[in-house]
């Protein structure tokens, strides 16, 4: 962790808690690691991980494109300064408004099911998503390439769909795949690439092979990149990748304050952030590193619990911490992805502010919501 206690205390005093923090140096370092590993592959940031407009502008200035899964994300990419050639519209259930926006912007559309052939705007530029139907090393809610997944076409459906798209006058670039998120084993990617390349005998060469993202934070990027380039080479295709969590997770933290403790057979450390600010531990069973910003002689085992009136509002269970007291600051690591982007206004709790550490000061990226912001659209 590159942030000092003094800097964190300063952030809490200036912006309050809960508070999302990002480190500009680590954002740049993560992108550099991807660029180094994947070489000349085109990078499209999966903005669902963290769509803050300031981060998007940063990536756009670095030449990164954007993978979008909604009208709002397409418009965010446009607002960040990206042209349509750097946008991909993905998703299993696209709306008419999303098709229209993709056509206006000139974005590449990922065809996720056979009936999309007749729904596409005329002359669309497309990729066809193939589902390799395999089990991967991640939480079931994060696996998108299993046989039971709602995403993509079966390998058997791909040749006919490609032919229909060409007959309909669309520009077919190639194939798309994405097997999940936070995948631990590089072998999963090797197996998925192998299944996709089996299609070469049935569909011929391609202009593009998009292999998605989904790499865990400690993944062997060089090994995955080598296998991905080999798969693209089978088709004679340019390689595209879609990192999301890998680019932003380690560059972000959630700063929360202890509001009290409770001992009722279990020790509860009660903090001012919970499921409304940080849903991943509850939704995916995700484990995140905790950094107590206090010292104490005694260390005990604690459950870290949020303020929501839900039994499942637990950030962590059974973790060793120095004995906490009201007012102490607790830092939650690897929170830059699917943290702020999945925060909600459940219980009419305003969403947190977001700030960036530039190396010498804090830059406000998003102000803290007010209660009035929450009901402003209600009539």
Swiss-Prot record:
EC number of this enzyme: 4.1.1.20
Coiled coil stretches, renumbered: none
Record's keyword terms, sorted: Amino-acid biosynthesis, Decarboxylase, Lyase, Lysine biosynthesis, Pyridoxal phosphate
Sample GO molecular function, one term: pyridoxal phosphate binding
Residue sites binding pyridoxal 5'-phosphate per the record: 214, 242-245, 338
Positions with a binding annotation for substrate: 245, 280, 284, 310, 338
Cofactor(s) of this protein: pyridoxal 5'-phosphate
Catalytic activity: meso-2,6-diaminopimelate + H(+) = L-lysine + CO2
GO biological process, one term: lysine biosynthetic process via diaminopimelate
Pathway(s) per entry: Amino-acid biosynthesis; L-lysine biosynthesis via DAP pathway; L-lysine from DL-2,6-diaminopimelate: step 1/1
Residues at the active site: 309 (proton donor)
EC class: lyase
Disulfide feature: none
Modification N6-(pyridoxal phosphate)lysine occurs at: 48
One Pfam family in the UniProt entry: Orn_Arg_deC_N
Subunit structure as annotated in this protein's UniProt entry: Homodimer.
Similarity-based family: Belongs to the Orn/Lys/Arg decarboxylase class-II family. LysA subfamily.
Stored NCBIfam families: lysA
Function in brief: Specifically catalyzes the decarboxylation of meso-diaminopimelate (meso-DAP) to L-lysine.
Protein name (database record): Diaminopimelate decarboxylase
Species annotation: Deinococcus radiodurans (strain ATCC 13939 / DSM 20539 / JCM 16871 / CCUG 27074 / LMG 4051 / NBRC 15346 / NCIMB 9279 / VKM B-1422 / R1)
Gene: lysA
């Amino acid at each position: 962790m590159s942030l000092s206690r003094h800097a964190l205390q300063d952030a809490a005093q200036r912006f309050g808690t809960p508070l999302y923090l990002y480190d500009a140096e680590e954002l740049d370092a993560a992108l550099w690691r991807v660029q180094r590993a994947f070489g000349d592959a085109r990078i499209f940031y999966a903005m669902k991980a963290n769509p803050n407009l300031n981060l998007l502008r940063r990536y756009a200035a670095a030449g990164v494109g954007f993978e979008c899964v909604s009208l709002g994300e397409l418009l965010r990419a446009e607002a960040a300064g990206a042209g349509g050639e750097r946008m991909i519209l993905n998703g299993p259930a696209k709306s008419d408004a999303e098709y229209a926006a993709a056509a206006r912007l000139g974005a590449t559309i990922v065809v996720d099911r056979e009936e999309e052939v007749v729904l596409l705007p005329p002359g669309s530029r497309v990729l066809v998503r193939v589902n390799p139907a395999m089990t991967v090393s991640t939480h079931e809610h994060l696996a998108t390439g299993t046989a039971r997944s709602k995403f993509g076409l079966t390998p058997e459906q791909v040749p006919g769909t490609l032919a229909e798209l060409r007959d309909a006058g669309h520009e077919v670039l190639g194939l798309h795949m994405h097997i999940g998120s936070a995948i631990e084993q590089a072998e999963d990617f090797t197996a998925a690439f192998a299944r996709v390349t089996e299609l070469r005998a049935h569909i011929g060469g391609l202009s593009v092979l998009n292999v998605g993202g989904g790499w865990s934070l400690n993944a062997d990027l060089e090994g995955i990149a080598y296998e991905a380039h080999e798969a693209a080479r089978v088709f004679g295709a340019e390689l595209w990748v879609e990192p999301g969590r890998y680019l932003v997770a380690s560059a972000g933290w959630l700063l929360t304050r202890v509001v009290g403790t409770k001992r009722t057979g279990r020790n509860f450390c009660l903090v001012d952030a919970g499921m409304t600010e940080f849903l991943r531990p509850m939704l995916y069973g995700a484990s995140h590193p905790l950094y107590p910003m206090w010292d104490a002689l005694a260390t005990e085992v604690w459950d870290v619990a949020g303020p929501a009136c839900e039994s499942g509002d637990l950030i962590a269970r059974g973790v060793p911490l120095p004995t906490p007291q009201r007012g102490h600051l607790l830092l939650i690591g690897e929170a830059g992805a699917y943290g702020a982007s999945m925060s909600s206004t459940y219980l009419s709790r305003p969403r947190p502010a977001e700030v960036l550490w530039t190396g010498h000061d804090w830059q406000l990226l998003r102000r803290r919501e007010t209660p009035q912001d929450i009901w402003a659209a209600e009539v």
